[in-house]
Amino acid sequence: MKLAVRDKIIQRNPCNSITNIKLEEIEREYLNFEEIKQLSETIPITENAKEVARMFLFGCFTGLSFANLVTLTFKQIEGDTVKFFREKTKTWHHVPLNETALSLVGDTAKCDPQDRIFSVPKHRQCSYILEKWGKEAGIKKHLHMHLSRHTFATLSLTSGADLYTVSKLIGHKKLATTQIYAKVIDEKKRRAVNNLPRLEI
């Protein structure tokens, strides 16, 4: 519009009177440890659903995206570390695996290094399975694959990891992206304090 005024196409910029619109931040949902435990105790019976559940839980303890999880092979597991390429940032990442994540992978020695760790259906079917599993487990939140990533970031921060470390673990290029999770935690803390009973003094 400024260029149009400069080039005398229009006389006045109609946007001059418009103030900047601040978009309201959407609070990122995540699962707390009790909810993860709840899910782990109600693993689905069918093979497809079991695999989706295993992949989702692995995501909760590694922060890997759906794209990285579905293509993850056994050769990417190097001891207690998972190595993956993040297409979005065009960089390689190494994420340490804790005991829970390692148990979800299973015995890599007995597997073909080229095989995929998770044999899951297409994204839409995975979403359906997750939604159904969440309802059956009594989880009030909407289960989707990206929720596992939010969960990993938030649980890492609440467990004492600093922002820089978490941003490196989940492959964020900008620290500001990871700060969204820290803000969620701060707001939850503030709400918890505000909900304490009031004492009249």
For the regions a language model picked out, list residue spans one by one.
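Basic, Lys/Arg- and aromatic-enriched nucleic-acid-binding interface segment
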Residues: R6, I10-F66
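Conserved tyrosine-mediated DNA breakage-rejoining catalytic core shared by Y-recombinases
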Residues: S17-E25, E29-E35, T62, T71-G106
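Short basic/aromatic active-site micro-motif
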Residues: E51-V52, P121-H123, K140-G160
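C-terminal catalytic core of tyrosine-transesterase DNA break-rejoin enzymes
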Residues: L57, F61-N68, K132, R149-K173, ...
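Short, polar N-cap/turn motifs at the start of nucleic acid-interacting alpha helices
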Residues: Q76-T81, K140-K141, A161-I180, E187, ...
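Catalytic-site neighborhood detector that most strongly recognizes the C-terminal catalytic loop/helix
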Residues: R86-K90, L102, H123, I170, ...
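C-terminal catalytic core of Y-nucleophile DNA break-rejoin enzymes
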Residues: E87-G106, D112-K132
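C-terminal secondary-structure termini that scaffold catalytic or DNA-interacting sites
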Residues: D107, V120, P197-I201
